[in-house]
């Protein structure tokens, strides 16, 4: 009787844990990365507000299989900031 309750509890707990997981592609270091990964994205345009920073982070999450996000980063080559997708 006690073991059947334990099994039922274990299955319920496992189901709850797995229901919140999100599938993302895994990229191994030796594999080829998408061009958006680890680079500046000048085609993003102006990147100078919090909304732009959030939009940049989402674009990098959606477009780069490393799933590290991104943000508006100042660069020396141009005034202002540019969207940059993170590597690590």
Curated annotation (Swiss-Prot):
Signal sequence bounds: 1-23
Any single biological process term in GO: defense response to fungus
UniProt main location, coarse: secreted
GO cellular component, one term: extracellular region
Keywords: Antimicrobial, Disulfide bond, Fungicide, Plant defense, Secreted, Signal
A Pfam family reported for this protein in Swiss-Prot or TrEMBL: Defensin_like
Cross-referenced InterPro entries: Defensin-like_20-28
Similarity field: Belongs to the DEFL family.
PANTHER family from the UniProt entry: DEFENSIN-LIKE (DEFL) FAMILY PROTEIN-RELATED (PTHR34453), DEFENSIN-LIKE PROTEIN 24 (PTHR34453:SF8)
Designated name of the protein: Defensin-like protein 24
Species of provenance: Arabidopsis thaliana (Mouse-ear cress)
């Amino acid at each position: 009787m006690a073991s059947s309750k334990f099994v039922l509890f274990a299955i319920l707990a496992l189901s709850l844990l797995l229901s919140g997981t999100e599938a993302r592609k895994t990229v191994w270091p030796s594999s080829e990365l998408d061009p958006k990964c680890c680079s500046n994205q000048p085609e993003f345009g102006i990147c100078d507000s919090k909304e732009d920073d959030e939009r940049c982070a989402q674009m990098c999450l959606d477009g780069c299989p490393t799933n590290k996000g991104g943000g508006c980063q100042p660069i020396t080559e141009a005034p202002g900031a540019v969207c940059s997708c993170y590597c690590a």
